[in-house]
């Protein structure tokens, strides 16, 4: 998802994918386990220590922005891409699982995710249509590779091999995911999410 958004917005697709792969790795560390407020910050340090590009390391930290009401959005384009991808994934998965906010109950902070998503797109000047992003995210969330027919997996592997691409689980995953688009997402879910994000933005900018 991050790679696709990066490519569409003019950022580095490979770095977008790499940042997404590493974005939650620091949650497994003892440091973040003891001090949760350091998530992202420690991820940046760990990524830098591993020799990752500075843009990738910074994106892992800054993708959490805005962290609170009134906070700035992520400063770099790559971090904005990752911030958008993570919030899209959270919203699509949350609504897809029926975990919609109700009244004052929002245990998965989907309202905050929606506002952060909208603000990052607008204030970051990312020229990618919101509805298209939501459709793509919902389509990806609907994919369960365990349910993909074996012959389709074999076809994907054969196609990769024919193009000289190393055949591994990640490559097959990307090949299968690339065939899913808006047509695979529930239109009602897309409409609901679209309205949800716009509602949060109206309230924020009205204030």
What is each of the regions a protein language model found here?
Residues 1-207:
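Amphipathic alpha-helical "coupling" segments that flank catalytic cores
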């Amino acid at each position: 998802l991050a790679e696709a958004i990066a490519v569409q917005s003019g950022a580095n697709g490979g770095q977008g994918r790499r940042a997404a792969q590493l974005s939650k790795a620091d949650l497994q560390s003892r440091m973040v386990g003891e001090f949760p407020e350091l998530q992202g910050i420690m991820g940046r340090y760990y990524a830098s220590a591993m020799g990752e590009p500075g843009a990738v390391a910074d994106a892992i930290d800054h993708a959490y922005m805005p962290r609170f009401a009134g906070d700035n959005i992520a400063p770099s384009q790559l971090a904005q891409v990752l911030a958008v991808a993570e919030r899209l994934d959270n919203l699509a998965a949350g609504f897809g699982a029926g975990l919609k906010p109700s009244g004052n109950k929002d245990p998965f902070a989907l309202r905050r995710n929606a506002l952060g998503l909208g603000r990052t797109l607008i204030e970051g000047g990312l020229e990618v249509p919101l509805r298209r992003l939501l459709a793509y995210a919902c389509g990806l969330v609907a994919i369960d590779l365990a349910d993909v027919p074996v012959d389709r997996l074999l076809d994907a592997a054969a196609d990769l091999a024919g193009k000289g691409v190393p055949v591994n689980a990640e490559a097959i995953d990307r090949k299968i995911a690339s065939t899913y688009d808006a047509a695979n997402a529930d239109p009602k879910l897309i409409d609901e999410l679209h309205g949800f994000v716009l509602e949060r933005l109206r309230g924020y900018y009205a204030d």
